[in-house]
A protein has these predicted regions:
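Bacterial N-terminal signal peptides that target proteins for export
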Residues: 1-9
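Short, linear, compositionally biased motifs with a strong N-terminal bias
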Residues: 13-14
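N-terminal signal peptide c-region/cleavage motif recognized by signal peptidases
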Residues: 17-18
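Central antiparallel beta-sheet cores of small beta-barrel/beta-sandwich binding domains
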Residues: 27-222, 226-258
Length: 258
């Protein structure tokens, strides 16, 4: 491929990628953090260029031994998502190579794919936690990263497909320049992190259904979550995989991934 053609191809690819992000169904993913964070709490400008060289993989690797809460389909069937590793791509600084597993009931499927950061927003007013616990802990800034994900299940498994959509995560950076998973407001009833909003599509393209997940709360989950202080599944959906969760909240003894 000539240098001119290669440059043209790269330009088209970047334009297409940006267009896909812009046209993704107009979802304000920040709204899923309300009332923890509101859009008005964030600086208008994106700080992507400023933080591009930082490694944000910690926000996805923080819960390596745990699973996210999630659902798939209109009847809120429980799906478990476990990120085993997220590694920053040295050549594409916005991209992270991801490996993990998904499970519906006891059917476990490995997946791999990418997280791509598109925007980085900074909080205009810092949050310090209960009784300002973190106020003097050397925190330089707090923010939200927003991006896209594409995760491909192993094709060797029956009824496999791929997940795609928008992602977001709360983070903070220390005075020493370290990126951290933001759990400062963990004691808040509205706390959540790592919100994923999107779809699952079968490889044969016969099915495309809604599938969302997150840490501690699930974004855009309708009447599934009826909990006040923490996530609690609606009794209406217990038969869709949530009965074991309601009996053993943290799923330590019955972790299907072990």
């Amino acid at each position: 491929m000539s240098i001119i053609n290669r440059a043209f191809f790269i330009s088209i690819f970047l334009l297409f990628s940006a267009d896909v992000f812009a046209q993704n169904p107009k979802i304000d993913i920040v709204k899923f953090y309300e009332p923890l964070i509101f859009q008005k709490d964030l600086a208008r400008n994106s700080y992507l260029k400023k933080y591009l060289k930082q490694d944000f993989s910690v926000v996805w690797n923080y819960h390596k031994n745990d699973e996210s809460l999630g659902f798939i389909g209109e009847h809120y069937q429980r799906i478990r998502i476990k990120i085993l590793s997220a590694v920053k791509d040295k050549n594409k600084l916005q991209t992270y190579i991801v490996n993990g597993k998904s499970a519906v009931d006891n059917e476990i499927k490995p997946f791999q794919g990418t997280f791509t950061i598109r925007q980085i927003k900074i909080l205009t007013d810092m949050r310090w936690g209960v009784d300002d616990e973190y106020k003097n802990k050397g925190i330089k800034a707090q923010g939200v990263l927003i991006g896209e994900y594409k995760l491909y299940q192993d094709r060797n498994f029956e009824n496999s497909g791929f997940f795609e959509g928008l992602l977001s995560a709360l983070w903070y950076i220390t005075d020493a320049g370290e990126i951290k998973f933001d759990n400062i407001e963990f004691e808040s009833d509205s706390y959540r992190n790592n919100q994923f909003v999107g779809t699952w599509t079968s490889y044969d393209r016969t099915k495309k259904i809604k599938s969302n997940w997150g840490d501690y709360r699930i974004p855009d989950s309708g009447n599934l979550d009826i909990g006040a202080g923490e996530f609690s599944p609606n009794k209406k959906y217990l038969k869709n995989g949530w009965e074991s969760y309601s009996k053993n909240l943290h799923q330590i003894a019955n972790d299907v991934f072990n």
